[in-house]
Amino acid sequence: MEAVVFLFSLLDCCALIFLSVYFIITLSDLECDYINARSCCSKLNKWVIPELVGHTIVTVLMLVSLHWFIFLLNLPVATWNIYRFIMVPSGNMGVFDPTEIHNRGQLKSHMKEAMIKLGFYLLCFFMYLYSMILALIND
């Protein structure tokens, strides 16, 4: 059963890694003016909720399966994703708003956040892979 938990977490983490790379590529395209702000933000806002749900499911799964260290490692990122989604101002299009993305260095902060998440998801990927192999060996 433990191997199945880590296999699901590993697959979910792969999806989150690809999503983070997509965020970085799209934001860098906006930074270089290859796409306009409206199309960039609509592309990225489409994937905010799947990222939130995917990471929250893994966090809850680690809580339910009593893997406390991994749960506590995932909790801050899941909390940040939920906070960022809840705190979107009412007039904005979403987390990524085309009218505000060039203001106050938001583009740089979104890019930095995507890079940090990519590093975190890569760390989690190898941690889940190691844990899955360990669970398969112990069974």
Swiss-Prot record:
GO MF entry, a single one: CCR5 chemokine receptor binding
Keyword terms, alphabetized: Endoplasmic reticulum, ER-Golgi transport, Membrane, Protein transport, Transmembrane, Transmembrane helix, Transport
A Pfam cross-reference name: Cornichon
Membrane-spanning segments: 5-25, 57-77, 118-138
Record-level GO BP terms: endoplasmic reticulum to Golgi vesicle-mediated transport; protein transport
Keyword Membrane part of the UniProt annotation: yes
Location (main, coarse): membrane
Lipid bilayer topology: Multi-pass membrane protein
Keyword Coiled coil attributed: no
Compartments, record wording: Membrane; Endoplasmic reticulum; Endoplasmic reticulum-Golgi intermediate compartment
GO cellular component, one term: endoplasmic reticulum-Golgi intermediate compartment
Family membership: Belongs to the cornichon family.
Oligomeric and partner information: Interacts with Sec23/24 complex components SEC24B and SEC24D. Interacts with CCR5. Interacts with ADRB2 in the early secretory pathway.
Physiological role: Involved in G protein-coupled receptors (GPCRs) trafficking from the endoplasmic reticulum to the cell surface; it promotes the exit of GPCRs from the early secretory pathway, likely through interaction with the COPII machinery.
Protein's UniProt name: Protein cornichon homolog 4
Lineage: Eukaryota, Metazoa, Chordata, Craniata, Vertebrata
Primary gene name: Cnih4
